A protein has these predicted regions:
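Basic, Lys/Arg-enriched alpha-helical interface segments
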Residues: 1-51, 60-64, 71-107
């Protein structure tokens, strides 16, 4: 279970993202380098004695899709991001595949 202070900060960051959309920048958002998707970003916040990152991307419908989160404090930064990006890429691809399937069904 994610501690309440982390949930609160995640919700606050998600609300900022909803208000500002793709224009939200540092220190709240940064690009995730190494992703298979050029539009992969990370929400950045500190909470519960942790340094949290949430991988997300704006999909073709311009919705922000939050994909995976993790506390990078105390971890090898390289290993942390490799794992975060791999999971985010996989989940985002599944999301895009579902959108494509829905679009095909509507035709």
């Amino acid at each position: 279970m994610v501690p309440q202070p982390v949930q609160d900060e995640l919700l606050a960051s998600a609300k900022l993202l909803r208000v500002f959309g793709p224009q939200l920048g540092r220190p709240h958002v940064d690009t995730l380098n190494g992703s298979a998707f050029a539009n992969m970003k990370e929400l950045r916040f500190n909470a519960g004695d942790g340094v949290w990152r949430v991988a997300f991307a704006f999909d073709p419908e311009r919705s922000a899709i939050l994909l995976v989160a993790g506390d990078k404090s105390g971890a090898s930064e390289r290993r942390f991001y490799k794992s975060l990006i791999a999971e985010a890429d996989e989940r985002y691809q599944r999301h895009l595949d579902r959108l494509a399937a829905l679009k095909t069904e509507k035709k």
